[in-house]
């Protein structure tokens, strides 16, 4: 679970909540939680529409890992919790080192469009061999096509990924949306009593 925002309640939202009975507060927080869930999911859809940085075919990372794993988890009379159950999104948020999985020594980073989203061991590119450079201290998976080398993947023991400040929507925008929704809900609740 990602812990990106701890408390999005503005002083105005807190003042609105104080006016309500516990059951009404819980109902209000449930609606604000759903609003927050919608806003975060919309942010992930927007990020997905940007495509990927290398220009390779889309993997729909932001939809698959972000939007599909975001949900309102818990609501009480005092809190509403929206969670994003994705280690990949957590890694985007915090950054860090990516290493190969168990039993693997290297990550294979695609260098060509036809290699993107394909595992080298899948066998979809025939004639692959490892080419090493002692001078550069790196290795590649390549093919020999008509006497010319064609590089498909760069092999590396790890990759350092910087934290992405755009992983989650801007906090000020979320607070403004939640405050507006709280005002709307307060008017609706007051109109019912």
Over which residues does each language-model region extend?
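Short, Lys/Arg-rich flexible segments
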Residues: 1-193
């Amino acid at each position: 679970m990602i812990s990106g925002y701890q408390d999005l309640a503005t002083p105005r939202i807190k003042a609105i909540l104080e006016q309500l009975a516990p059951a009404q507060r819980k109902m209000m927080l449930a609606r604000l939680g759903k609003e927050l869930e919608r806003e975060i999911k919309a942010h992930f859809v927007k990020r997905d529409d940007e495509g990927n940085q290398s220009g390779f075919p889309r993997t729909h990372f932001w939809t698959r890992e972000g939007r599909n794993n975001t949900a309102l988890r818990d609501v009480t009379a005092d809190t509403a919790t929206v969670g994003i159950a994705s280690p990949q999104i957590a890694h985007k948020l915090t950054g860090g080192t990516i290493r190969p999985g168990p039993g693997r020594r290297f990550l294979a980073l695609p260098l060509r469009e036809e290699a993107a989203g394909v595992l080298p061991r899948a066998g979809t590119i025939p004639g692959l061999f490892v080419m090493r450079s002692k001078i550069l201290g790196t290795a590649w998976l390549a093919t020999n096509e008509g006497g010319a080398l064609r590089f498909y993947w760069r092999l590396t023991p790890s990759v350092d990924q910087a934290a992405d400040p755009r992983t989650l929507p801007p906090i000020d925008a979320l607070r403004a949306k939640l405050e507006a929704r709280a005002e709307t809900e307060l008017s609706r609740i007051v109109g019912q009593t």
